[in-house]
From Swiss-Prot:
Residues spanned by motif 'KMSKS' region: 286-290
Taxonomic lineage from the root: Bacteria, Bacillati, Actinomycetota, Actinomycetes, Kitasatosporales
Originating species: Streptomyces coelicolor (strain ATCC BAA-471 / A3(2) / M145)
UniProt keyword Oxidoreductase, yes or no: no
Keyword DNA repair: no
Protein name: L-cysteine:1D-myo-inositol 2-amino-2-deoxy-alpha-D-glucopyranoside ligase
Signal sequence extent: none
Gene (name only): mshC
Amino acid sequence: MHAWPASEVPALPGQGRDLRIHDTATGGPVTLDPGPVARIYVCGITPYDATHMGHAATYNAFDLVQRVWLDTKRQVHYVQNVTDVDDPLLERAVRDGVDWTALAEQETALFREDMTALRMLPPQHYIGAVEAIPGIVPLVERLRDAGAAYELEGDVYFSVEADPHFGGVSHLDAATMRLLSAERGGDPDRPGKKNPLDPMLWMAAREGEPSWDGGTLGRGRPGWHIECVAIALDHLGMGFDVQGGGSDLAFPHHEMGASHAQALTGEFPMAKAYVHAGMVGLDGEKMSKSKGNLVFVSQLRREGVDPAAIRLTLLAHHYRSDWEWTDQVLQDALARLDRWRAAVSRPDGPPAEALVEEIREALANDLDSPAALAAVDRWAALQQESGGTDIGAPGVVSRAVDALLGVAL
């Protein structure tokens, strides 16, 4: 599966700063020091109802991570998956009377278009769950043969007790885990499981649903968590720098994925930092496919909204915050974009070197994009009020906003 085209990242004078970011697993900030090649895995979409603002906010956060690393002159090895076979996708295809593979392809193509328009840097490896199945099967077999998984009526479940570190990502109590498991694709009430929290690794073939050769597992399809584990281990190995996604993935998805990987390899941790973006709401509730309260990037683009304004709307909120999408936040972003473009359209202006350092400092401090935007606002206001004589300063600002924030002025 191919990703989307990369926009050019302008080179900036000076050197970026190491990223200090909130790690869900430790509950506090950690300073990331990846070495010459930074490794990041971000969980991708299930391809239906793409791309809503919750999606866009998540991928904006991890695009900023990449940009901070690139500014430190590191290479970035970025992997993202597509959950292109899953119960919600199959259910949507049945509801709409379409082939599930056609729906997945259509929505993945739309997602690529939206990411291109928003100037999100693409992953080097963009991997669908279906294409990863040949690598998933032997991992499930290994877990089963090692006693870390067991069969139940043809299905295969992971035993959470096989990982002594289970619970170390989300730090939730058992009752909360059980509740969230039921809400987020698990089956804690299924009779016969050793532990209600045990997640499915391999689902035996069901009538009328797609299935694949599972070797000694029999025909079926993989569980959600093992898909990401297989892709991450194949392309990044253990101990990569950042595992990213929305805050609703901390449990069960990232918790279970970490336990799968740690049980498979005997190594700890799967990722050095678990980073989670907040939720975007509409009309007082979290945007979600199940509720249908969605604002789509493609819809706004069709209405003629500049993608740079959409991106500024996302950047106006700290990535870990939960926030509400309203017409006003978009109007504020459009006005900000106009002010910035007017400010950089002049041939000279106030000196820009300090501004570049302010943006760098803000982003290195847990991706504080609102602080970065405020710094640019101050420069633009100074340009509007009194101007300046620094030839080329507007060009420096334009390149910095592009390179560090992904906004084309």
